[in-house]
A protein has these predicted regions:
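Residues forming the flavin
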Residues: 1-203
């Protein structure tokens, strides 16, 4: 879902596996429906990093093991920006084209990391929400917007992103979107993840 536009697909345009879900149901497994959202990806050079609060990486990360050699760690500098009243107003302006508001996207979403449009709806008393701008890698040109996942239409995404400090001239490389997916009821699995109904099938 990008606004009211929707189509069958896997993540990032991959092939849909809806036939697999159908096959599992035909073989006696119960499935349900869940939803997750992704964030717009920004062009790194279009962000004014000097306007933002820098978030430095730790100089030496903690290891899970005391054994082995230390590895060279090249951190990536991230930055903090925030939504504001203009951001929220832009989103409300486009609620008539929001699949979340219009009810076309009604599957259960993540409990602890709601989309930014969901936050605007559920927490109207909040004037601002923190957004972390995270380069995908040190040499990359793509920036991930942590805490800004959305299913809003592209126009709403571009307008709202450009209300953020440091993002007034931002370019969206890939829009955020919501994706609905099937899951198999986990009570149908053994603790070692083999299905109870189909011996030898692990999920």
């Amino acid at each position: 879902f990008i606004g009211l536009t929707s189509y069958k697909s896997g993540p990032l345009g991959m092939v849909s596996v809806s036939g697999l879900s159908k096959s599992l149901r035909e073989n006696g497994l119960k499935t349900g429906r869940l939803r997750t959202d992704t964030t717009p990806r920004l062009l790194a050079d279009s962000v004014d990093w000097d306007m933002l609060d820098r978030q430095e990486s730790i100089s030496e990360p903690e290891s899970f093991s005391h054994f082995g050699q230390k590895r060279v760690y090249k951190g990536v500098i991230c930055a903090l920006t925030r939504t504001n009243a203009d951001t929220h107003e832009v989103m409300r302006k486009y609620f008539d084209r929001s699949p979340l508001v219009q009810g076309t996207l009604d599957s259960e979403g993540p409990r602890y990391c709601p989309s930014i449009d969901d936050k605007v709806i559920r927490f109207p008393e909040k004037d601002t929400h923190p957004i972390f701008l995270e380069p995908i890698n040190p040499e990359g040109r793509e920036v991930y917007m942590q805490n800004f996942s959305t299913s809003m239409c592209l126009e709403a995404q571009l307008e709202s992103v450009r209300t953020l400090k440091g993002c007034g001239s931002a370019h969206i490389l890939r829009p955020g979107y919501a994706i609905e997916y099937d899951f198999v009821d986990p009570t149908q699995l053994y603790p070692w993840l083999e299905t109870r109904k189909i011996p030898g099938l692990f999920l």
